């Protein structure tokens, strides 16, 4: 056995030496020892989030952008008369003409927390002396409890934009950036007030911004553990570990406890299932009515909407539009009117002239993207909600597709940082004029 083993070992060493000699002959400059692969760097959830710090009511991102988040009080647009709706749209058009180039409008929905309201109603009931009024108040409390058990949903709306430098080559100081963002926020407040919307003012803007991120990343945790409790808990853990509390990163308070990105069609955050869907470029209707997004906004609990608008340079678009119309007109001459290509080309030419007329009528050209986030406590409920959402959009002649193998990009794009992933942007961008965007 020993002789046989030694013979095998000798053959193995001989083969190894031949391979080594052949490798040296082919790569004379390379070292003989094989290069070790670099170990993958361990990344915590705090490091993963693209946020450097939150200060002065602004989010400083890791890619050196400055983002402002405004909370907007909504109005019930569908209950307004046709004349009022038209007036609101024109007021919003006025804002879009002077708004930042990139805008993100975010809507988050979750089950309404009515405990505070019920506590206040109970206190008023105790103070009431009239027995008939007490009876009415008891009925009201019972009605609110019954209603909240089935369909009570609270919605919050946010307008997000970033600082846009006037001159890219010039270095801008931080105080100039803060002043520019504050001016943009005041402009938004003035014009949205004309639409009937109020911008919610907060005593501590940093705390508000941190709370928004904490609520988004910790859907279930934020109801049981508000942000002040979370901050106290994290600080206590750091002190117990003997770490410096003064240098703690803001992501330590907002980061979720667990984040699972291993699946192709969903993301798990703190055990809650999130899936991201998009309306593809060809999934929109050609004509829209005022308030056409209300259907998605009122879809129910666990449905979040991210609406992106990216204004394009007018002169470049007009040049490209004229060029494309000329190309399509030359193509249609060679196509027969019985071919399916003829209808597509005819539609493209008509759309081109429509956009050309709109631009000549002082409208702006935008690329619009629509990202939908669906959350559920288990996979079965998640699949049911996805199917129901797709049916809802099909009923309105719209299409909806899951972001397969792009869930991580969907997660990062859904953060209130006015940053849509490039691949998702290309897959879902749709051209729209100011009137369509404002509707």
Question: Predicted segment positions?
Answer:
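Extended, folded cores of ATP/NTP-driven motor/assembly subunits in large transport
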Residues: 1-438
């Amino acid at each position: 056995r020993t002789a046989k083993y030694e013979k095998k070992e000798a053959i193995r060493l001989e083969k190894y030496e031949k391979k080594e000699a052949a490798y040296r002959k082919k790569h004379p400059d390379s070292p003989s020892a094989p290069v070790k692969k670099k170990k993958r760097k361990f990344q915590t959830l705090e490091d993963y989030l693209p946020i450097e710090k939150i200060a002065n009511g602004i989010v400083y991102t890791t890619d050196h952008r400055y983002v402002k988040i405004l909370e907007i009080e909504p109005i019930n647009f569908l209950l307004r008369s046709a004349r009022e709706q038209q007036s609101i749209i024109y007021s919003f058009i006025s804002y879009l003409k002077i708004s930042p180039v990139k805008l993100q409008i975010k809507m988050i929905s979750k089950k309404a927390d009515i405990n505070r309201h019920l506590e206040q109603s109970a206190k008023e009931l105790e103070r009431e002396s009239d027995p008939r009024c007490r009876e009415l108040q008891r009925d009201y409390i019972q009605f609110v409890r019954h209603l909240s058990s089935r369909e009570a949903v609270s919605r919050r709306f946010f307008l997000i934009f970033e600082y846009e430098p006037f001159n890219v080559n010039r270095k801008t100081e931080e105080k100039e950036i803060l002043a520019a963002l504050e001016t943009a926020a005041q402009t938004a407040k003035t014009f949205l007030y004309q639409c009937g919307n109020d911008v919610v003012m907060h005593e501590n803007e940093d705390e508000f911004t941190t709370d928004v991120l904490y609520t988004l990343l910790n859907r279930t945790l934020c109801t049981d553990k508000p942000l002040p409790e979370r901050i106290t808990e994290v600080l206590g853990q750091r002190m117990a570990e003997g770490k410096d509390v003064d240098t703690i990163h803001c992501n330590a308070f907002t980061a979720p406890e667990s984040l699972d990105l291993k699946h192709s069609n969903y993301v798990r955050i703190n055990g809650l299932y999130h899936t991201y869907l998009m309306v593809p470029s060809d999934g929109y209707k050609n004509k829209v009515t005022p308030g056409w997004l209300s259907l998605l906004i009122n879809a129910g609990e666990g449905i979040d909407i991210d609406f992106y608008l990216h204004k394009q340079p007018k002169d470049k678009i007009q040049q490209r539009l004229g060029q494309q119309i000329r190309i399509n007109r030359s193509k249609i001459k060679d196509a027969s009117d019985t071919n399916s290509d003829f209808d597509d080309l005819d539609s493209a030419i008509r759309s081109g002239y429509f956009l050309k007329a709109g631009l000549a009528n002082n409208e702006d050209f935008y690329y619009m993207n629509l990202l939908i986030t669906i959350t559920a406590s288990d996979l079965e409920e998640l699949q049911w909600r996805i199917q129901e959402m797709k049916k809802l959009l099909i009923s309105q002649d719209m299409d909806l597709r899951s972001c397969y193998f792009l869930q991580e990009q969907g997660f990062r794009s859904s953060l209130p940082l006015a940053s849509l992933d490039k691949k998702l942007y290309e897959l879902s961008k749709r051209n729209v004029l100011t009137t369509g965007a404002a509707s």
